[in-house]
Amino acid sequence: MENVNFTLNLFIEYLQIEKNYSEYTIACYKHDIGEFFEFMEREQIKQLQQVSYSDVRLFLTELHQRKQSSRSIARKMSSLRSFYKFLLREKIVSENPFALASLPKKEQKIPHFLYPDELEQLFVVNDLNTAIGQRNQAMIELLYATGIRVSECCNIRLSHIDFSVCTILISGKGNKQRYVPFGTYAKEALERYIQDGRQQLASKAKTPTDVLFLNARGGALTPRGVRHILNDIVERAALSLKVSPHTFRHTFATHLLNEGADLRSVQELLGHAHLSSTQVYTHVTKDHLRYVYLHSHPRA
């Protein structure tokens, strides 16, 4: 399987350099393709060129037998389809057996989001007299104010922020750039952190950096670091909820749409290439439904 692993490394390079995908996305591709490589070993398939449509169907059957969700199976098949598309382009294989496979319909899950009172509990636990507390407050205020992805948050540089018009230049998926606005709360938290806490953290760095969010050693904060920080904040807020960076993104979109923002504008703010990606947020909270009903129905 040496040649197979070498080919995977070529594909990963392509995702990093040409597609500019995040570390998390690339890790998902590696996991999905690695799972298929294990299947190839079990079936004694030595070369990628030898994989047939029958093998793909057998792999699909295995995934279903292991009770994997439709969403998970669809992602794996999509990863492998992209992998073979790359192999075709590089003339490593002569056909894409995954192109013929129909993807299972994804389950449409309503994204988990936070209510205002739950958000408030997260915003009051950080000690604003410390550098770490100032950084954490600025980070969660910004995540909620902008709906940016965790990878985008970690890539923000000081030069990307324009306080005069309260906007940030964001580099999104595929290196696509967009400007996102932020409000008063985020502005105050960012200014406090940049003027005080960030300088304290930056003084510990071996090499200077203009990345906005720094870790305790003065280096750039990573997506994994952000997730760890959020887990700690949620624990201190005594919330019995699972909150990830993406929860803030879901919350941002849900709150905007519930307050009357149009779908196209939210699509632009989130940096979605397709409107269908944004439409998942068109659910509304039960409280909002109740409010609309009470204020609109003649006999409510």
From Swiss-Prot:
Annotated GO MF terms: DNA binding; tyrosine-based site-specific recombinase activity
Transferase keyword on record: no
A GO cellular component annotation in the UniProt record: cytoplasm
Keyword DNA-binding: yes
CDD domains: INT_XerDC_C
Keywords from the UniProt entry: Cell cycle, Cell division, Chromosome partition, Cytoplasm, DNA integration, DNA recombination, DNA-binding
Core-binding (CB) domain location: 2-88
Localization annotation: Cytoplasm
Location (main, coarse): cytoplasm
Function: Site-specific tyrosine recombinase, which acts by catalyzing the cutting and rejoining of the recombining DNA molecules. The XerC-XerD complex is essential to convert dimers of the bacterial chromosome into monomers to permit their segregation at cell division. It also contributes to the segregational stability of plasmids.
Name under which the protein is recorded: Tyrosine recombinase XerC
Species whose genome carries this gene: Anoxybacillus flavithermus (strain DSM 21510 / WK1)
Name of the gene this protein is made from: xerC
